[in-house]
Amino acid sequence: AWPTIIGPGIPKAQLKLHYQQEFLVYVRDFPVLLARVHGQNPPSDVRRMLAENIYEEDTGGLSFGRSHPELFNEMMRGLGFDGETFRRTKLLPASARYRAWLEKVTASRDWVVGAAALAVFVEGSIKDRQEIQAPSKPKTETEIEAYIDAHPLIRHHGIDRQHMDLIRAHQKVEAGHRQDAYTMVVNYAETRSQQNAVLACVTKGLALWMAYRDSVAKACKLKKA
């Protein structure tokens, strides 16, 4: 159903339900979840990478001076959804199961499992392999603005560009974060036990994430494209 969610035909009421679940499952508390992994006291170089990510997520200190949850809410205001829309919603059952898993893995006694869940799985994308094998250069302002112009919320829903700083922030800082994510997990999942735990973690995460996305699509009454 993802092509429908990012396509021109989805009504705003359905789009709102999708974003409500995204916000409560991980967007609102993502800096806190990262901090839970940092609090497991990984090696100093990993703490530095996590701290930089937390700093950006919680303050926007590397981009626009506002936390990513705040920037998300700003983007939602551009769609006509106020903050109360997200405060008063409830998680769907599958969304709650995925969120509970995120809380469990970030409290793992082995920090590398939590790092794999958040930095590799949640923040990752289909482009990760390409990014790791051939790291992209930081995008220029012109390239970022071209990306904004092509964004589905601009093209299909008429959101004003001034509300899109969350997407700008992602384009500005995410390339470096992808390198950090794989560095910390690949370099420190040294034992067979750790490697198996990481694989089990992301496999479980994928199953829960797919069930979560399917439940949102069902609640939105969407059909597979």
Residue ranges and their predicted role:
Residues H177, N187-A225:
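Acidic, carboxylate-rich catalytic segments that either coordinate divalent cations
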Residues L34-H38, N73, R77, H151-P152, ...:
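Amphipathic alpha-helical segments within well-ordered protein domains
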Residues A13, L17, L91, L222-A225:
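Sequence termini and other peripheral, non-core segments
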Residues R48, Y55-H163, A207, A217-L222:
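Active-site-proximal alpha-helical scaffolds that flank and shape metal-associated catalytic sites
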